[in-house]
Design a protein with these regions (language model features):
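Short, Lys/Arg-enriched N-terminal segments with co-localized hydrophobic residues
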Residues: 5-29
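Glycine-rich, flexible N-terminal cofactor/catalytic loop recognition
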Residues: 30-77
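Acidic, aromatic-enriched beta-alpha/helix-loop junctions
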Residues: 72-83, 95
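Helix-loop module immediately N-terminal to the HCX5R catalytic loop
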Residues: 83-119
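Recognition helices and adjacent regulatory flanks at domain boundaries
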Residues: 103, 107, 113, 124-127, ...
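Catalytic cysteine-centered active loop of the rhodanese-like fold, especially the PTP/DSP P-loop
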Residues: 111-141
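Cysteine-dependent PTP/DSP-like catalytic domain, specifically the C-terminal lobe
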Residues: 135, 143-173
Length: 173
């Protein structure tokens, strides 16, 4: 791991959670990492560890984090960090997470689960959208999403959390 580059960043919030006991029993120990834009840019300045997957979230109208090196699996999505209902967001054209994007996350997770050893979640500040997606996956996989909510570092976006968790539960596989 690139601790020398990771820990020198001011805005790095880096927590690791093991997914679930069932996966550990199968030997599928997946590490979860939550980080901000600056941290992922720094991390991607050298090759990722093998079997790394990344979900990268950008604000509407912004570019994605620049990755010099890419992980083995990458999902990039654009949606704003607003905790409001779909109807209000659509009416105001605020570009919040859609159900289709939640389904993309669920499909990506189900595709990399059992293959990826590291799953990184990244958004602008590494505390709301990325934390919400990580919490939803942890809740789905191990009923341990509360670990993210209990942290003083994160403030998961509840709309994102509920959409991703619902998509994971509804998607076969």
């Amino acid at each position: 791991m690139k601790e020398d580059t990771l820990y020198c960043l001011l805005h790095l919030w880096y927590d690791i959670y093991d997914i679930d006991e069932q996966n550990r029993n199968r030997g599928d120990n997946m590490r979860i990492e939550i980080c901000d834009r600056a941290s992922i840019v720094n991390l991607a300045s050298t090759p990722f560890e093998p079997d790394t997957a990344l979900i990268s979230i950008a604000n509407y109208g912004d570019s994605f984090a620049e990755l010099r090196y890419q992980p083995d699996a990458l999902l990039r999505l654009v949606f704003n960090d607003l905790p409001i209902s779909d109807d209000a967001a659509k009416a105001a054209q605020l570009h919040t997470m859609t159900d289709a994007q939640a389904e993309q996350i669920a499909a990506f997770y189900k595709r990399v689960c059992g293959k990826a050893k590291i799953l990184i979640f990244q958004c602008e500040y590494g505390e709301s959208r990325s934390a919400a997606v990580a919490a939803a996956i942890l809740e789905y996989a191990s009923q341990n999403g509360k670990a993210v909510f209990a942290s003083d570092v994160y403030c998961p976006n509840m709309s994102v959390y509920h959409k991703v968790l619902a998509a994971l539960r509804e998607m076969p596989g």
